[in-house]
């Protein structure tokens, strides 16, 4: 539905199956990881001690408040140390969220992000840049059924029932992700200020069929 009504395109990212922080780095700074060492994470090697040009700093110069929201722990990838050096005024991580639902693998569901995004927008009188990082569909994906109900059934003529288990789990997490995005869009439409929503995927999932 969004692809039919909104601008969209392809995004080349430096990560597969993991490494969200490196995709974040490229998106926020415009710098390519090609200029860093093999396997390097700038969040680990540079940004804990040094600042770096970023879209957050650019928008701050234009009068925006800058906020990060992530429904995982703030110490993961040392984001709690990195984001101030990327120009963000505040960072709300899982530790500071209430009434968080979890998926069968224990990841926080992304529905909490809608609440936290609106809270950030309401926290200042200025224009705001809110960078939200979701976590719900993350792996490692199950190799055996978890017993939870799946509204979407996945079938294949070439993949075994056993190998379909992680695909089925992932597809149904995306189904919930669609519902979250609809809720977020509806909340932003009633927020009362002009809003630009940009969505991108950080990396493909680590799923394969034998």
Where are these regions (language model features)?
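Solvent-exposed soluble domains appended to multi-pass membrane proteins
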Residues: 1-210
């Amino acid at each position: 539905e969004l692809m039919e009504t909104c601008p969209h395109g392809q995004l080349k990212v430096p990560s597969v199956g993991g490494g969200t922080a490196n995709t974040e780095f490229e998106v926020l700074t415009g710098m390519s990881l090609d200029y860093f060492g093999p396997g390097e994470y700038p969040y680990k090697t540079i940004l804990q001690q040094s600042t770096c040009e970023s879209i957050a700093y650019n928008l701050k110069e234009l009068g925006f408040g800058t906020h990060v929201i992530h429904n995982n722990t703030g110490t993961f990838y040392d984001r709690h140390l990195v984001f101030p050096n990327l120009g963000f005024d505040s960072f709300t991580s899982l530790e500071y969220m209430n009434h968080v639902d979890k998926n069968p693998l224990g990841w926080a569901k992304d529905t909490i992000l809608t609440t936290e995004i609106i809270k950030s927008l309401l926290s200042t009188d200025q224009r705001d840049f809110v960078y939200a990082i979701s976590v719900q569909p993350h792996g490692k994906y199950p190799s055996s059924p978890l017993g939870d109900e799946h509204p979407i059934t996945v079938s294949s003529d070439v993949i075994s029932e056993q190998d379909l288990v992680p695909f089925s789990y992932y597809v149904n997490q995306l189904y919930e992700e669609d519902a979250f995005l609809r809720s977020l869009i509806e909340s932003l439409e009633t927020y009362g200020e002009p809003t630009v929503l940009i969505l991108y995927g950080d990396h493909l999932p680590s799923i394969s069929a034998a």
